[in-house]
Swiss-Prot record:
Classification via Gene3D superfamilies: Vaccinia Virus protein VP39
Entry-linked CDD domains: AdoMet_MTases
Gene this chain is encoded by: prmA
Keyword tRNA-binding: no
UniProt keywords, alphabetically: Cytoplasm, Methyltransferase, S-adenosyl-L-methionine, Transferase
Residue numbers binding S-adenosyl-L-methionine: 157, 178, 200, 243
Protein name as it appears in the record: Ribosomal protein L11 methyltransferase
EC number: 2.1.1.-
Lineage: Bacteria, Bacillati, Bacillota, Bacilli, Lactobacillales
Keyword Transferase part of the UniProt annotation: yes
Catalytic activity: L-lysyl-[protein] + 3 S-adenosyl-L-methionine = N(6),N(6),N(6)-trimethyl-L-lysyl-[protein] + 3 S-adenosyl-L-homocysteine + 3 H(+)
Cellular component terms (Gene Ontology): cytoplasm
Family matches, as NCBIfam families: prmA
GO MF annotation terms: protein-lysine N-methyltransferase activity
Length: 316
């Protein structure tokens, strides 16, 4: 019987995507996230300031490796890669542990994390192996969580989806920066966007996004490519959405302003509480006006507008 190894990494919440991506690059066959925030409150409303809730500052990233992989080498490589990034972000004190799993335990462990989840009024995320019958008006996003990048239920993704549902009216061009799983591109298509261009610096993410897009019929209007933020992009967009780290978002805002059409939107998420002011100042310096600010626990998301009429600005 084939066995698997479960490698658990405890890290500060802000490092979730970074550590997940590193583990996949180091050969993980899948990654699961345990976050206390995932179990707090399932009813969210666009534009509402969410109350602070009791939560842990750390999350657990669990990676799965076949027994043919020497996880001690993975641990050493992970530590080395992260040590190169300590000037970029504080991931806290890394805690790493491993456990052996039988094949059937691997399958069960995967599936216990993932169930169909209604995220917004219209959008429901469904694991690819699940038979799910949509109700009238319900739009289904099929994802394979076994390819990592989360299930689409993380607060940063949920707020991004709420924002897309609010601003998309049909016929728009959307740029999805740091696409990851491709969930925001798929949602944009379901919500009526005419054409979506998805970019990610990580070749693994580009592949994962394309595979997830292919799980959903009628997604021929999504184009996925490797790209460093919006460098070299010359496509005018009605909406730009980016769910990535705050330290990276601030390098996006000038190019976003250049590419967003008048009265268009910039949606940003993935912003940890302590870095909200930095991101807001960057967007406003580029010329955007804040329309909506969302908060869920430690995480912030926002909708900025490129407009000359600021009379309807809500502020944060």
């Amino acid at each position: 019987m084939e066995t698997w190894q479960e490698l658990k990494v405890t890290v500060k919440r802000e490092g979730e995507e970074l550590v997940s991506n590193l583990l996949i690059e180091l050969g993980a066959q899948g990654v699961a996230i345990e976050d206390s925030m995932d179990y707090v409150g399932n009813v969210d409303r666009f534009g509402e300031i969410f109350p602070e809730v009791e939560q842990q500052e750390e999350i657990v990233v669990t990676a799965y490796y076949p027994d043919t992989v020497d996880v001690t080498v993975v641990e050493a490589d992970l530590q080395a890669r992260i040590s190169e990034l300590t000037d970029f972000m504080d991931l806290g004190e890394l805690k790493i542990g491993t456990t052996a799993l039988a094949e059937e335990d691997w399958a069960d462990n995967w599936k216990k994390y993932y169930e169909p989840a209604r995220i917004t009024h219209d959008l429901t995320i469904v694991p690819s192996w699940t038979d799910y019958e949509a109700t009238a008006g319900e739009k289904i996003i099929k994802l394979d969580p076994g390819m990592a990048f989360g299930t689409g239920t993380h607060p940063t993704t949920k707020m991004s989806l709420f924002a897309l549902e609010q601003v998309l009216r049909g016929g728009e061009t959307v740029l999805d920066v740091g696409t990851g799983s491709g969930v925001l591109s798929i949602a944009s298509s379901l919500l009526g966007a005419k054409e979506i261009f998805a970019y990610d610096l990580d070749d693994v993410a580009v592949r994962v996004a394309q595979e997830n897009i292919e799980l959903n019929p009628g997604m021929e209007n999504i184009h996925v490519a490797a790209g460093d933020l919006l460098k070299g992009v010359e496509i005018e967009a009605d909406v730009i959405v980016a769910n990535i780290l705050a330290d990276i978002l601030i390098h996006l805002t000038d190019d976003a302003y250049r590419l967003v059409k008048d009265e268009g939107y910039l949606i940003m998420s993935g912003i940890i509480k302590d870095k909200w002011d930095m991101v807001r100042e960057s967007a406003e310096s580029a010329g955007f006006f804040l329309e909506t600010h969302m908060v869920q626990g430690e995480w912030n998301a926002c909708v900025f507008k490129k407009t000359k009429d600021i009379s309807g600005v809500i502020g944060g």
